[in-house]
């Protein structure tokens, strides 16, 4: 088809200007093209199996690449490296990625489709309610679905997850008898750790029915019912005062239109001398304006309603709501390592996952998702941060 030939011309011409890594492409007709510096450490081989690949990239960007992987339109020696190469050459990729897309339409969709309370529940259910059995097969025994922080490269994932919890606790500095809120408690890993190691009262909220049921039973099993209260509640319905507030990678589910509500809720539920500890994934400030008006693979297939704020955007809402940023730490490399471990276990446990009713398309979708995130952190296009807040 003519449109495929035109797409090839656009993509291959743009790839001539890549500055990082080396990419070798074998076309459907057997012709081999080489781009970049062959002396680079990051070397990627890609074999095109369907002539529509480049058209899909031009039409839909990361969504097109992910869908093409799911349909076996290409094979590569290393999917994560391929995505990392595109991420490190993002300005080159932007010359063709999604240029047939309609930014205005995406902008309108983002404005119309908001994370209301009901829609937030639907969005969470689509991902987290895939099933506790599914997630328990490939997460560590803390059942923690957020980045670990490793003290050493050899540290086990379980220990690194508890290390992450401790670092966040160190940011909020709780003392005996304090009343603490966790916004977005997942399966209760942080609640168990905090309740076991500190003499505090803890309210934990989630809007996932499956997570609520699991976390409630977990806390009961640990004998922590007197200290920890798990609730199904939207953060916008909170009306209390807490000495400390913690939130681990929940802000990504808030949505662009509700970041103000999120920080306003924190402000209104924090005691005057209280502290806040947040772990968040952020997108680089230089990429934010393009990102906020376009849907990517993760928003399309993994986290509907998901949105990564930039550090600048976070600072704006922190200031607007009368809060002050204190300590701040970056852990991007720790997330890429966490994702590598998750992907390896996911693939190792695939036969068991498959028995739960998931098909090969689902497997490839998750392989792409985990590799996509890993590459984002390696390239520093996205970051993992822990930071503390207090009232001004």
Language-model-detected regions and their locations in the chain:
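Feature captures hydrophobic
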Residues: 1-162, 167
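Conserved beta-strand signature within the Rossmann-like core of class I S-adenosyl-L-methionine
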Residues: 273-281
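A short acidic, Gly/Pro-enriched loop at the edge of an enzyme's catalytic core
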Residues: 236-245
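Conserved SAM-binding loop of SAM-dependent methyltransferases across substrates and taxa
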Residues: 187-199
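Conserved class I S-adenosyl-L-methionine
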Residues: 176-184
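A short glycine-rich, Lys/Arg-flanked "PGG" loop and its adjoining helix->strand segment in the class I
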Residues: 260-272
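Substrate-binding/catalytic lobe of Class I Rossmann-like enzymes that use SAM or dcSAM, i.e.
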Residues: 282-392
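Conserved SAM-binding loop
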Residues: 215-216
